[in-house]
Amino acid sequence: MSSILLGVNIDHVATLRNARGTKYPDPVHAAEIAERAGAAGITIHLREDRRHIKDRDVRILRETLQTRMNLEMAVTDEMVGIALETKPEFVCLVPEKREELTTEGGLNVSGQLEKVKAATQKLTEAGIKVSLFIDADKEQIDAAVECGAPFIELHTGAYADAETEEAQQDELKKIAAGASYAASKGLIVNAGHGLTYHNVEAIAALPEIYELNIGHSIMGRAMFDGLEKAVADMHRIMLGARK
């Protein structure tokens, strides 16, 4: 079975920094440690309200990352403009509501097909690889294909938040079916949202999954074990699921 990559989301380093309006902890330093520990890429979400990652972080990380940047962003003219100026290796288009604590669901690509398609085309023409953050739903997967995005990221939030083992298994089956269907359509399949050290193994074991993007649980573990160990431990669990 092929290997699997870990993308580390460092948004919550910025959340902690912004809580006091200080210059520390610096997401740039966190990215350096995560890369050293085995991260294949660094994910950051530049939200419209700038609640954690700031424009300054995007600029500096683009210059300093040794791996690659995955810039999560809403489908707006402002964000597309920032991406075209910054030119990250990857952009992941996500839904966004100002009142939410975190991204609550997948992007409704089929419901705004022309808008997403236009953004995807602009970014692709600039040499940026585009991923769409969607639920494991055939309609959304088909819409992603129509948009011309080479990657999707399957939303694993319902799986992660399931309150019973039966419910979690049902969600896992949906993700597995979605990953298989997307791969059959020629898409490269990533996944993420809500994944922890306790629930990641089953998702990592799905053969179609190319990369997992994980942040909150790694940063939580890092408070006690240190960031380098937290990243390395997550990567080890993921790789173990592929043996």
Curated annotation (Swiss-Prot):
Pathway: Cofactor biosynthesis; pyridoxine 5'-phosphate biosynthesis; pyridoxine 5'-phosphate from D-erythrose 4-phosphate: step 5/5. InterPro entries: Aldolase_TIM, PyrdxlP_synth_PdxJ, Pyridoxine-5'_phos_synth. Its main location: cytoplasm. It catalyses: 3-amino-2-oxopropyl phosphate + 1-deoxy-D-xylulose 5-phosphate = pyridoxine 5'-phosphate + phosphate + 2 H2O + H(+). Disulfide bonds: none annotated. The keyword Transferase applies. Keywords: Cytoplasm, Pyridoxine biosynthesis, Transferase. One of its GO terms (cellular component) is cytosol. SUPFAM superfamilies: Pyridoxine 5'-phosphate synthase. It is an enzyme of class 2 (transferase). It is found in: Cytoplasm. 3-amino-2-oxopropyl phosphate binds at N9, R20, G194, G215, H216. GO terms for biological process: pyridoxine biosynthetic process. The active site is at H45 (proton acceptor), E72 (proton acceptor), H193 (proton donor). 1-deoxy-D-xylulose 5-phosphate binds at D11, H12, R47, H52, T102. The keyword Cytoplasm applies. Belongs to the PNP synthase family. This is Pyridoxine 5'-phosphate synthase. It comes from Aliivibrio fischeri (strain ATCC 700601 / ES114).
